[in-house]
Amino acid sequence: MSILEQVQPIETMLPERYYTMSTEDMEKRVREIKEKMGKMLFIPGHHYQKDEVVQFSDAVGDSLQLAQVAASNKDAKYIVFCGVHFMAETADMLTTDDQVVILPDMRAGCSMADMADIEQTERAWKELTKLFGDTMIPLTYVNSTAAIKAFCGRNGGATVTSSNAKQMVSWAFTQKERLVFLPDQHLGRNTAYDLGIPLDKMAVWDPHTDSLEYDGDIEEIQVILWKGHCSVHQNFTVKNIESVRKNHSDMNIIVHPECCYEVVAASDYAGSTKYIIDMIESAPPGSKWAIGTEMNLVNRIIQQHPDKEIVSLNPFMCPCLTMNRIDLPHLLWALETIERGEEINVISVDKQVTAEAVLALNRMLERV
């Protein structure tokens, strides 16, 4: 493969004609193909997707929910995953060999997942083992690459979601004295703190300097947090909360645990995407909410609950930019290529990586 092909793979190039089609025509074609293919086609859509995509999704949920739903669907030959790359990887690992997982736009990545690559992680593990010996177990947020999941699998660790992080961190401490949590330092910190681990027992590993950030006696360290974060949830601040408290004293503040510790501590509630959705759903009419999570989801919640006053915690918030790469034109392009008997943007994880990553996934699924 030439350098040019590596830099600009043809699969990522949306044909020009899709830019000139009307929304009405694109929606009509998507409906036609869905009807024609029937059960042979399954379209999972993440909560953070645009409405123009979600309207055609056969299931809407978080990344692991969608991968599990895809895996339970044995009728579908084609799974067109409307999410980001690591989600499609998980779907590929959990589905059968004769099912094809397609990502409509290969540029739909995740900045947080990319903050922990396998070379950095192997190097960190080697250095940390010099310091702590065989006292550590790795856990990775499902928002990570297949290679990182595989690393955890072969080192006795597991995956976690924002819904089950407490259960999995508790389990980890029944296995080893110390936890290495990848790639989101905030979810790791917030979860460990909720379980009673003091902040001064937590250190941060910086993969760019290959160094441990900690001021005390390293023998006191219980949790080692990878220095990664969600670019969306990083944008919610304590100042946002102070502004809401000042201008809307009766407004409830609910945030995702990917927000930093200070924001979570200052909020009224914190929990997974499902937790946020369920909390708003069960709230009484007339209640007021400021939500600290991705903007497409916040806007959808606002539309679904006109009886409640709901705003984004950060009034200048934007959607997840990489998630937003999946749009109606790319969805239609993926479907029309399938209709022609072609396959583009196929997600296929190496068999050895899959085997080890599934170990990590199954250790979680067996316990939640």
UniProtKB/Swiss-Prot annotation:
Pathway: Cofactor biosynthesis; NAD(+) biosynthesis; quinolinate from iminoaspartate: step 1/1. GO terms for biological process: 'de novo' NAD biosynthetic process from L-aspartate. One of its GO terms (cellular component) is cytosol. Binds 1 [4Fe-4S] cluster per subunit. Gene3D superfamilies: NadA-like. [4Fe-4S] cluster binds at residues 110, 230, 320. InterPro entries: NadA (IPR003473), NadA_sf (IPR036094), Quinolinate_synth_A_type3 (IPR023515). Its cofactor is [4Fe-4S] cluster. It is found in: Cytoplasm. SUPFAM superfamilies: NadA-like. GO terms for molecular function: 4 iron, 4 sulfur cluster binding; metal ion binding; quinolinate synthetase A activity. It catalyses: iminosuccinate + dihydroxyacetone phosphate = quinolinate + phosphate + 2 H2O + H(+). Keywords: 4Fe-4S, Cytoplasm, Iron, Iron-sulfur, Metal-binding, Pyridine nucleotide biosynthesis, Transferase. PANTHER family: QUINOLINATE SYNTHASE, CHLOROPLASTIC, QUINOLINATE SYNTHETASE A. HAMAP family: NadA_type3. This is Quinolinate synthase. It comes from Bacillus cereus (strain ATCC 14579 / DSM 31 / CCUG 7414 / JCM 2152 / NBRC 15305 / NCIMB 9373 / NCTC 2599 / NRRL B-3711).
